[in-house]
């Protein structure tokens, strides 16, 4: 003879079973969705890799053509720059402080990207003795974001541990993964401002071997100012 089970207990068991099945279905759906998202992220990474490779090949071809014709190869003007604060902790003029804040270089060895245009270059001139900057390669941008990248989410500094952090904040702009973020910064895409503001200012180390002479400009054998493509060497030494 089967054991009597009160009606209220039967209802509770039924509800629990229904809830268990619903949660199992939800986990299954979430797993399938995440699998699909990962496939999309891999596809994007492969697409960008092909795009970067084609761009590099085009430059090589143009240089080769210039040599053959006896012409000079003129590289395209840089669209994005990376600035690093190397001086100035105490007793700064209010105008200098304001500009450093605009570039998000509040602390020593902070680094940040900025769009290269007439306005930004004129502004950067006002703080040149305190910063150095130059034009990062795609590889440098990638290493900065992967090795030292943190997101600014609701005013909090969050490590970029997975793509969902990017997607939650920038998905509405079509930026759903770290590779999207790198591409947007590298190409100075239509949502560069949003992508750049999403990134917390980079915290870099003192360069291996130290600075040469922070009192003088880079072109005079010192450290501050525009070091153009050689910013990549400095970033490498500070990662």
From Swiss-Prot:
One of its GO terms (cellular component) is cytosolic large ribosomal subunit. One of its GO terms (molecular function) is structural constituent of ribosome. Disulfide bonds: none annotated. It comes from the Eukaryota. Residues 9-28 have a biased composition (Basic and acidic residues). It holds the Pfam family Ribosomal_L30_N. GO terms for biological process: maturation of LSU-rRNA from tricistronic rRNA transcript (SSU-rRNA, 5.8S rRNA, LSU-rRNA). Keywords: Ribonucleoprotein, Ribosomal protein, RNA-binding. Residues 1-37 are annotated as: Disordered. PANTHER family: 60S RIBOSOMAL PROTEIN L7, LARGE RIBOSOMAL SUBUNIT PROTEIN UL30. Belongs to the universal ribosomal protein uL30 family. This is Large ribosomal subunit protein uL30. The lineage of its organism: Eukaryota, Sar, Alveolata, Ciliophora, Intramacronucleata.
């Amino acid at each position: 003879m089967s054991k009597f089970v009160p009606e209220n207990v039967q209802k509770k068991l039924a509800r629990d079973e229904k809830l268990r099945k619903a949660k199992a279905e939800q986990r299954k759906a979430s797993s399938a969705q995440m699998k699909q998202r990962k496939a999309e992220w891999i596809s994007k990474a492969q697409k960008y890799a092909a795009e970067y490779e084609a761009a590099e090949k085009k430059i090589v071809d143009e240089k080769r053509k210039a040599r053959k014709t006896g012409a000079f190869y003129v590289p395209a003007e840089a669209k994005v720059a990376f600035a690093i604060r190397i001086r100035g902790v105490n007793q700064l003029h209010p105008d200098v402080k304001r500009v450093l804040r605009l570039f998000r270089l509040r602390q020593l060895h902070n680094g940040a990207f900025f769009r290269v245009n007439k306005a930004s270059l004129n502004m950067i001139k006002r703080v040149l003795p305190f910063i150095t900057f130059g034009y990062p390669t795609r590889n440098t941008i990638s290493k900065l974001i992967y090795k030292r990248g943190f997101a600014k989410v609701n005013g909090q500094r969050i490590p970029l541990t997975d793509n969902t952090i990017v997607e939650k904040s920038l998905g509405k702009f079509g930026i759903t993964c770290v590779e999207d973020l790198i591409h947007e910064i590298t190409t100075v895409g239509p949502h560069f401002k949003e992508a750049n503001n999403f990134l917390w200012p980079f915290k870099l180390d003192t360069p291996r071997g130290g600075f040469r002479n922070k009192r003088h400009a880079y072109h005079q054998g010192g450290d501050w100012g525009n070091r153009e493509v050689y910013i990549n060497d400095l970033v490498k030494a500070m990662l």
